[in-house]
Amino acid sequence: MTARSILQEDFDSGVKEATAWALGYIARHNKTLAQAIVDAGAVPLLVLALQEPELCLKQISASALFDISKHNIDLAETVVDAGAIPFLAKALSNPDTKLKRQVLLALSSIAKHSVHLAEPIIEAEIFPDVLVHMAHPDECVVKAAAMLTREICKHTLELAQLIVNIGGIGALVELISTSKLTVRLPAIMAIGYIAGHLDQLAIAVIGSKGIVHLSTILYEENDDHTLAVTVWAIGQIGKHTSEHAKAVAVANILPKLLQLYNNPNSSEDLKAKCNTALKQILQKCMYIEALESLLHDSPPNILKYVLGQFSKILPHDPRARRLFVTSGGLKKVQEIQADPGSTLLEYIQIINCCFPDEIVRYYSPGYPNSLLEAVEQYQPKCPSLFAIEEHLSSDIDSKSSLSSFNEEEKEEHVRKLC
């Protein structure tokens, strides 16, 4: 007897549960085995089993639908075409924790493939109930709810805006700030997707303290995968305008990104994410204090973006030019070795043009040594000591003669009076 006939016939619920469980375990391995389950006509019967009153059968059927739909868009469409979404949505209202988790995972595995498959889930009106589940006592339910939210909002601006309109950002940020590491990863990704779609949505994330909590994760966590996801989300927030970039810079995130990028122990994925995020944010950043903090430790591929921003700021901002000199920025720029014809050299030349030539020379490498060398080579042009002494002697004689003349003049004047 086939699994299909077992699910069709009025067998004991335990037998049906075992059959559905077996179908799911077969399908979960790869898309070929999952396709074989579909070709056998099992999907409509799993949907029927989802409607049975037995709680355990509902759980296993939802799990099997997840195992089938996760592999590719065609398998997910088969599940949707079989009418699974309305019954999965209805099952979400069941108080059983395990069923909630399986339902949310099944819906996530459908939604992730395309906007075409995500829209029917939205139409099933399970939001904002899904957001409510982010505060569920069970961590697995919380994570599954965040995963579904992530898969919905990643596709289009319209879907992301819908999640935002029903309070999605607040729920996600709250989850990030209160939950454990593995639970909050999908929430971090959801925040990144939302912020990446539109500058106004990124501002909403910033206003909800999203950057603050992401910064905390960046400084407290050591897991490279978590750090890579967090760095990616930060890049999505800071990439839009100078206002967004400043929000990231004020949170003291840029030096940490540079530190992670320069760390030889960081994974290649983390380094790549840091490189991309720094590039995205620096190209918009006009916050000079944050830019200066990156001057000393940035490798050339990052430094060119830092100097590129200075080349935009300094020509028009006298205060920034003064600060750039007093903080040691101009001195550091003179020490940079740039290849002829490179973008980096072009930025250095633009920056140097913002200052008087004597200031640029003063901060150039080797300038103090050149001054000392000039002192050593200088030929004094002072008058000789003999000439000075002769001049002093002549001056004394002149004063003495004048004094004698004055005495004689006085005596003559007295005689006349007498």
Listing of model-derived features with the role each one plays in the protein:
Residues 1-5, 15-17, 21, 44:
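Eukaryotic helix-linker segments that join adjacent hydrophobic helices
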Residues 2-5, 45-47, 87-89, 107, ...:
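Buried hydrophobic core positions in alpha-solenoid tandem helical repeats
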Residues 11-27, 39, 53-70, 81-82, ...:
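Alpha-helical solenoid repeats of the armadillo/HEAT superfamily
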Residues 32-35, 74-77, 116-119, 158-161, ...:
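Recurring C-terminal helix/loop segment of individual leucine-rich repeat
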Residues 286-288:
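Eukaryotic alpha-helical solenoid repeat scaffolds
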Residues 362-418:
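Eukaryotic intrinsically disordered, low-complexity regulatory tails and linkers enriched
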